[in-house]
Amino acid sequence: MQKFDIKGTKTEKNLQEAFAGESMARNKYTYYASKAKKEGYEQIAAQFLETANNEKEHAKIWFKLLHDSDIPDTATNLLDAAEGENYEWTDMYDRMAKEAREEGFDRIAYLFEAVGKIEKEHEERYRKLLANVEGGLGCSKDGDMIWQCANCGHIHVGKQAPGMCPVCEHPQAYFQLLAQNY
């Protein structure tokens, strides 16, 4: 994709608006699909989901143009995500809860506060993952751990995930710690 110098232009603002609009439409259509499915309209649900996927791809076009035609590396994305979550719980939801409470909407204020606490957990998760990526610890831990290939389900026990899955040959990055607390 061609690169453009759009910083500070109306086109940059339009790309941001297009990205936001397509992103919101995608979520809305997935909610509509769930409702249609609950009401027994399988074909309509499928159409909503197909359109939601189209909207996701449209949003990706605008996102890439906003980021010099490329999605940044994982460390950059983790930092961006952590900072976004930080803003949500320290500023956005705190402010929104206060305003809702001032207007007499105590239940909505509670929900803003409760979601804000979840966003704090999200920030902490992203910062831990970033530290793992920066420290090369994503696929290596102290002591034996149970690793599972996210692609085929192969289980490996060791301090480090294998460099490549011996079953499906996916790279080490596909291994994750096996979740066993159901």
Language-model features: locations:
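Non-heme di-metal
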Residues: 1-182
